[in-house]
Amino acid sequence: MSKLVTASRLDNVNYDIRGKVQQEANHMIAEGIDVLKLNIGNPAAFQMWAPPHTHDAIREHLQEAEGYSDSRGLLVARQAVADYCVKRKRIEGVTADDVFMGNGVSELIQMTLTALLNKGDEVLIPSPDYPLWTACVILEQGTPVYYACDEESDWNPDIADIRRKITDKTRAIVLINPNNPTGAIYDDEALKEIAQIAREHDLIILSDETYDRVIMDGLPHTSIAALAPDVVTLTFNGLSKSHRLCGYRVGWVVVCGPKEGTEEFREGLYLLASMRLCADRKSVV
């Protein structure tokens, strides 16, 4: 019998936030050591529960979730996301057809990079980073290239460093705003500068906005897609943090900006969504 081993493409893929770090923490807890876990954004672990009406709504409509849906997600859910983008986030022209629902943003990050990257493509990622972005880029045989976020400047992106890191292999810029792990919220001026870089170099912006409704000090949050309607921006969000529903796995990615020229990518994303049949339905009926 041949030995069962992993594929070589996993050789440099790491995700220790849920790997060795968590395993060691669990070992310490088993030995009676008090461990405060700051590595995973899981509100339930801190007794931050979902609003009761969310559970009531799910129970009321649970039977409706027994069958498959459109691979992009239920139309009513996609329309709700589109309305949120247009009315709350001021992103122009978003319709339900621009929305892909997923089993959390994590699944959609991997699906998006699978559809987007060729071997050797470079993706600019903020440092410090949320490690899933690095892991998924490497898994898809891309190359993560890190741009600095300076603590002395309230962890804002170093625009000059972003410009220095661009090559003819650069495909996209990852923006995590509000930022995980630093907590920084980028002002409009920084977002406009990043959008201008994407405009100049024909880059796609991948904007992870998972924490946009978990802002404790009242600062405003702006979606970069609202400031740059002429730039293709994939905007990621979900209910894990805003509604404290991490375990329900409700996320979405919205293809914002010009529709012309994105048709092939949308078809590719639809193909990948179809291969997993559909996202979980019970939380979005």
What is each PLM-predicted segment?
Residues 209:
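Walker B catalytic acidic pair
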Residues 55, 226-285:
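Conserved core segment of the aminotransferase class I/II
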Residues 31, 140, 200-201, 231:
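Helix C-cap/helix->beta junction micro-motif
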Residues 65-196, 213-227:
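Conserved core of the PLP fold type I
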Residues 4, 11-104, 111:
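N-terminal small-domain helix-loop-helix segment of the aminotransferase-like
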Residues 177, 205-206:
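Residue-level marker for buried hydrophobic side chains located in beta-strands
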Residues 122, 172, 204-205, 234:
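Hydrophobic "anchor" residues on beta-strands that sit immediately upstream
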